[in-house]
Amino acid sequence: MVDSHGSDTECSSKKKKEKTKEKGVYRGARMRSWGKWVSEIREPRKKSRIWLGTFPTAEMAARAHDVAALSIKGSSAILNFPELADFLPRPVSLSQQDIQAAAAEAALMDFKTVPFHLQDDSTPLQTRCDTEKIEKWSSSSSSASSSSSSSSSSSSSMLSGELGDIVELPSLENNVKYDCALYDSLEGLVSMPPWLDATENDFRYGDDSVLLDPCLKESFLWNYE
């Protein structure tokens, strides 16, 4: 009788272990009767526990527990996913609200898209996606700025060309015409009519002679004839 009872106990314990493995139970995660998973962690040196939330999968509850364990116990914490320790968020402070917020954020993170052993430089998926978005945005903004600068330079060159066509000043050397000839005083004075020489009071003062403008003299000559 004793032997049969002992064998029954061993069989029941093995069944419990197998059932636990099938359910995928993690540290700090418990399955409710309605199928949801809850996560909680005991506060250090206290009997109370911090409620981390209710989640649809065991993995989400396990990640929430890992965040809380890292926040409270640090490097000595026993984690469900030690390979994710560097990628999990950290709470702003050790208050219960901040730990719950960080745990909920970790539960919503998706680590199934790309296997971690295939990722280069141990970069988390979310961080790499954000980096790719930033690079695409920076490249598009740089191309837009270069196109705007080229368009502005072309428009400025067109504007300067139009202004050059409109504002075209005449050449002073080619267009200015002299109606009167210039006479060098060393080549001699232009001979004036006799009646100009006779009017001493009007055009001569002592020994100095007043030189008239050639145009004025020409008008006098026409009047004289």
UniProtKB/Swiss-Prot annotation:
Keywords: Activator, DNA-binding, Ethylene signaling pathway, Nucleus, Phosphoprotein, Transcription, Transcription regulation
A single GO cellular-component term on record: nucleus
Example GO BP: ethylene-activated signaling pathway
Key word DNA-binding present: yes
Segments of skewed composition (Low complexity): 138-157
Chain positions with Phosphoserine modification: S95
Residue ranges, annotated region (Disordered): 1-26, 134-157
One Pfam family in the UniProt entry: AP2
DNA-binding region(s), chain positions: 25-82
Gene Ontology terms for molecular function: DNA binding; DNA-binding transcription factor activity
Positions with biased composition (Basic and acidic residues): 1-25
SMART domains given in the database record: AP2
InterPro entries: AP2/ERF_dom, AP2/ERF_dom_sf, AP2/ERF_TF_ERF_subfamily, DNA-bd_dom_sf
The keyword Transport belongs to this UniProt entry's keyword annotation: no
Similarity section: Belongs to the AP2/ERF transcription factor family. ERF subfamily.
PANTHER family per record: ETHYLENE-RESPONSIVE TRANSCRIPTION FACTOR ERF042 (PTHR31985:SF232), ETHYLENE-RESPONSIVE TRANSCRIPTION FACTOR ERF042-RELATED (PTHR31985)
Record protein name field: Ethylene-responsive transcription factor ERF042
Protein's organism: Arabidopsis thaliana
Gene: ERF042
